[in-house]
Regions:
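Intrinsic disorder and flexible coil segments
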Residues: 58, 97-98, 123-125
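A glycine-rich phosphate-binding loop feature that marks nucleotide/adenosyl-phosphate handling sites
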Residues: 98-105
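Aromatic-residue-lined binding/catalytic grooves and analogous aromatic/hydrophobic interfacial grooves
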Residues: 106-143
Length: 143
């Protein structure tokens, strides 16, 4: 479970995903977005749209996703971009995109509204973390 944050732009960040990460990232991202709905959203909405069950709800990236609407919306845009990149590379739509792109477009009902994102979680060994999360993730993924 992680958000490989290679760029401030969710599209550029998705395009930078290595193949071995890209195959699993639409699912992991969907799990984080669904967990946001399960924790700060409506259980009725989750059940009506058959959202994934809560997963790794205390993971730093999953917590980050539900901290505020700006975080959630960035991650949702990244989710769509991951899906587009997956389709470009593999010629088919990822199952998580097919199932969840429409229900996840809606913000969780009780998420804190904000136009500004909080600092992205750096879920990696301490030696790679620094003030620049883009550099931290690039260093982490190349070592």
């Amino acid at each position: 479970m992680n958000i490989f944050y290679f760029s401030e732009c969710p599209i550029t960040s998705a395009k930078a995903q290595p193949d071995k990460m890209l195959v699993k990232m639409p699912l992991e991202t969907a799990q984080m977005l669904c967990t946001a709905h399960r924790i700060v959203g409506s259980e009725d909405y989750c059940n009506k749209h058959d959202l994934y069950k809560k997963a790794y709800w205390n993971h730093p990236c999953t917590v980050w996703a539900r901290e505020c609407s700006a975080n959630y919306l960035w991650l949702y845009a990244h989710f769509l971009a991951l899906g587009n990149e997956y389709k470009f590379r593999y010629g088919r739509e990822h199952a998580s995109i097919t199932k969840l792109k429409m229900p996840l477009v809606r913000l969780p009902a009780n998420i804190k509204l904000s136009y500004k994102r909080t600092p992205v979680a750096q879920a990696m060994p301490h030696e790679y973390k620094n003030d620049d999360p883009i550099k931290a993730y690039r260093d982490y993924c190349t070592h």
